[in-house]
Every structure is written in structure tokens, then in C-alpha cells.
UniProtKB/Swiss-Prot annotation:
Membrane topology annotation: Multi-pass membrane protein
Gene Ontology CC entries for this record: membrane; mitochondrion
Gene Ontology terms: biological process: mitochondrial respirasome assembly; response to hypoxia
Name of the protein: HIG1 domain family member 1C
Organism: Homo sapiens (Human)
Primary localization class, coarse: membrane
Cytoplasmic compartment residues: 1-26, 80-97
Gene: HIGD1C
Length: 97
């Protein structure tokens, strides 16, 4: 086998190096997770100042906002990977001819 192969056994790789490798492969997943944590943190902080709003309504709004951020990040990741795999090679291969 060649030495430049990307595969490595799970025992050889630590959690931090695995997280870094996966973040390089799909960078929008950590962005989605960070956005989710941010929205939930802000929602829990604002829970104290919700005035006369019901708790269930506040939690539903927080959940919808967090899901929206994650779905948006996943959608941007899919669009970026489609661009990288299909659109960019088509333009750069035509410019060389």
C-alpha cells in the first residue's frame, strides 16, 4: 500500500485529530453545530426575560431557530460540495483547452 493513503485505524487516531480531519472534509458541519449551540445559549439566556410569553412557546421558537440554522448550514455544505465536484472542474477544464 502507498504511504500517502488517507485511511488510518481508529486506534491510531485521537479524538482531536479525528475532529480536525472531519472538519476539513466537511467544514459546514462544525459551523452548524456552533450555530446550534449559539442559538440554544441565547435562547436559554433570554428565558429569564421572556415576560408574559409561555415557556412552551419560547422553547418552540428556540428549537425552530436552532433547526433552521443547522438546516441552512447543511444546505450550504451540500451546495459547496456540488460546486466543488461538478461546476468548478467544468470551468477550469474548459479554460485549459
Amino acid at each position: 500500500m502507498s504511504s500517502d493513503n488517507q485511511w488510518s485505524a481508529d486506534e491510531d487516531e485521537g479524538q482531536l485529530s479525528r475532529l480536525i480531519r472531519k472538519s476539513r472534509d466537511s467544514p459546514f458541519v462544525p459551523i452548524g453545530i456552533a450555530g446550534f449551540v449559539t442559538v440554544v445559549s441565547c435562547g436559554l439566556y433570554k428565558l429569564k426575560y421572556r415576560r408574559d410569553q409561555k415557556m412552551s412557546i419560547h422553547l418552540i421558537h428556540m428549537r425552530v431557530a436552532a433547526q433552521g440554522f443547522v438546516v441552512g448550514a447543511v444546505t450550504l455544505g451540500v451546495l459547496y460540495s456540488m460546486y466543488k465536484d461538478y461546476i468548478r472542474p467544468r470551468f477550469f477544464s474548459e479554460s485549459k483547452k
